[in-house]
Amino acid sequence: MKSLQKGFTLIELMIVVAIIGILAAFAIPAYNDYIARTQVSEGVSLADGLKIRIADNLQDGKCTSEGDPASGEVGNTDMGKYALATIEGTPDANLAGLTPKDPNGCKVKIEYGKGTAGDNISPLIKGQMLVLNQLVNGSYDKDSSSTVKPKFLPKALKEATP
């Protein structure tokens, strides 16, 4: 009487390994892009938090302030896990004559890789910079000096960029 063999043949196992390899070839780059996009979004969130500081500073006719952390004042920067956001620029002298979608002269520069966990940042955006112009209506538009690739930007910034 012949015994029945159980299990997979070598060719079946090789086919499964090949299929897993093909799937990984697509999944790993997509996952790396996803990580980079989430880290860029963290920097944009930092910039959103700076909007109120810019509005307060504009009341004094400037974009930046000399904050004293010892007295409870906040400065021109916000640091996140992967990025450092800094307020820069000089307000336009003719703010009253601008339309809501015109830049007001204030900018937020986001530097990736300078956060508290900067060593763990995606290599796709490490050392990259995103510069956002604040518009009169308070929203942001991407500046042409930005080095972050457009595919990593949040949808709102992609649509706002000409």
From Swiss-Prot:
Subcellular location(s) of the protein: Fimbrium; Membrane
Transmembrane segments: 8-28
PROSITE patterns with a match to the protein in the record: PROKAR_NTER_METHYL
Propeptide: 1-7
Positions where N-methylphenylalanine occurs in the chain: F8
This protein's UniProt keywords: Disulfide bond, Fimbrium, Membrane, Methylation, Transmembrane, Transmembrane helix
Cystine crosslinks: C63-C106
Xref: InterPro entries: N_methyl_site, Pilin, Pilin-like, T2SS_protein-GspH, T4P/T2SS_Core
Topology term for the membrane: Single-pass membrane protein
Pfam short name (any one): N_methyl
Keyword Transmembrane helix on entry: yes
Coiled-coil region: none
Induction note: By PilR (PilR/S system) and RNA polymerase sigma-54 factor/RpoN.
GO BP annotations listed: cell adhesion; protein secretion by the type II secretion system
Primary location class: other
GO CC annotations, alphabetized: membrane; pilus; type II protein secretion system complex
Disrupted gene: phenotype observed: Deletion mutants do not colonize the ovine hoof. Mutants show also altered secretion of extracellular proteases and twitching motility.
Gene3D superfamilies, A to Z: Glycoprotein, Type 4 Pilin
Similarity annotation: Belongs to the N-Me-Phe pilin family.
Role noted for this protein: Major component of the type IV fimbriae that plays an essential role in twitching motility, natural transformation, and protease secretion.
Name the record gives this protein: Type IV major fimbrial protein FimA
Species, as recorded: Dichelobacter nodosus (strain VCS1703A)
Gene behind the chain: fimA
